């Protein structure tokens, strides 16, 4: 199994991408291909002890930055670490790609280079969402700001398969995000999607309100990418604010400091549950290849976990299951 890591993608590349690659080959029986600036990558690799025959470096003369325009950069920067990596997957020279680089460019590259699975109109970004009951998956988290009702049906199919096959959630509950649980509430998009999802090949449980999402009411949270991205960013910001406020309160006096020491194990466990590095990255579901988008500020641990995520994705044949799930509806649903 060969996995490409875009060594130049992310806020701390190539330091953390190389670190993650090294940890990955130590923990998994795989071959890693690092794409990017070869001298910089090799300068990092010499710092580690690892099975050298299992990490390959492919030099790329270009790099896509966060300032680059997504579609233009994919089309013009043919020798960038991201595009070269995507082409390796497209040409079956690699089985998956992981990148912490420019999100828009990676999503565009997924569509332009890898292409869509037959029957999928809109691929979707599907990050893990930590809840009080464990984890859920949020589909879509930003790939599609505007959607049609059938797109939400697609998201339900893909999210349900991913939740069951990779996250190991048995018979996952799928819900559409709405301002109320009643079937007649919401925008036309959500109301029409509700009717489609009722007949979908998954365990549809109706609408979920935003306040119930953190409680784990739904295993698969379905919404358009605009709504999903707002939910994701709000949750990230809220979690950060809560920890900052707790720290401020715990440092007020001797008694609160003692309390903090007593609560430290529980708080550490809670913080770990909310830590995105534990989950690797977010797959772009619906493209003809395994593509994992890692967080821009990922560390080596997150990159290593993204590799593990990609392995599980392939071992459980998620792409094949998505293709089968969509085809069961009939082609006329997606014309």
From Swiss-Prot:
The record lists the lineage as: Bacteria, Bacillati, Bacillota, Clostridia, Peptostreptococcales
**Swiss-Prot/TrEMBL catalytic activity:** a fatty acyl-[ACP] + phosphate = an acyl phosphate + holo-[ACP]
UniProt record, GO biological process: fatty acid biosynthetic process; phospholipid biosynthetic process
EC assignment: 2.3.1.274
Q: What is its main location?
A: cytoplasm
Which family is this sequence assigned to?
Answer: Belongs to the PlsX family.
Q: What is this protein called?
A: Phosphate acyltransferase
Q: Name one GO molecular function term.
A: phosphate:acyl-[acyl carrier protein] acyltransferase activity
Q: What's any one GO cellular component for it?
A: cytoplasm
**Where can this protein be found?**
Cytoplasm
| The entry's keywords | Cytoplasm, Lipid biosynthesis, Lipid metabolism, Phospholipid biosynthesis, Phospholipid metabolism, Transferase
The record's SUPFAM superfamilies line, in alphabetical order, gives: Isocitrate/Isopropylmalate dehydrogenase-like
């Amino acid at each position: 199994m060969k996995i490409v890591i875009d060594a130049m993608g992310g806020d701390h590349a190539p330091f953390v991408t190389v670190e993650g690659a090294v940890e990955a080959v130590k923990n998994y029986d795989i071959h890693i291909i690092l794409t990017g600036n070869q001298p910089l990558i090799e300068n990092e690799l010499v710092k580690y002890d690892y099975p050298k025959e299992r990490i390959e470096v492919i030099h790329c003369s270009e790099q896509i930055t966060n300032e680059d325009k997504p579609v233009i950069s994919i089309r013009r920067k043919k020798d960038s670490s991201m595009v070269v990596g995507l082409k390796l997957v497209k040409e079956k020279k690699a089985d998956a790609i992981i990148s912490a680089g420019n999100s828009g460019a990676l999503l565009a590259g997924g569509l332009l280079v890898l292409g869509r699975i037959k029957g999928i109109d809109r691929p979707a970004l599907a990050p893990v969402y930590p809840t009080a009951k464990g984890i859920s998956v949020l589909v879509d988290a930003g790939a599609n700001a505007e959607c049609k009702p059938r797109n939400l049906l697609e998201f339900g199919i893909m999210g349900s398969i991913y939740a069951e096959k990779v996250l190991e959630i048995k018979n996952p509950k799928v819900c559409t995000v709405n301002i109320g649980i009643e079937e007649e509430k919401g925008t036309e998009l959500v109301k029409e999607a509700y009717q489609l999802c009722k007949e979908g090949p998954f365990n549809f449980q109706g609408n979920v309100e935003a306040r119930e999402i953190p409680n784990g009411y739904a295993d698969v949270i379905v919404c358009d990418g605009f709504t999903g991205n707002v939910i994701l960013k709000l949750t990230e910001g809220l979690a950060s604010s809560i920890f900052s406020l707790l720290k401020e309160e715990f440092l007020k006096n001797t008694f609160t400091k003692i309390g903090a020491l007593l609560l430290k194990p529980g708080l550490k466990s809670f913080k770990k549950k909310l830590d995105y590095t534990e989950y690797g990255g977010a797959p772009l579901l619906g493209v003809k290849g395994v593509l994992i988008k890692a967080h821009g500020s990922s560390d080596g641990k997150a990159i290593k976990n993204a590799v593990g995520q990609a392995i599980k994705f392939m071992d459980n044949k998620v792409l094949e299951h998505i293709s089968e799930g969509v085809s069961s509806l009939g082609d006329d649903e997606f014309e």
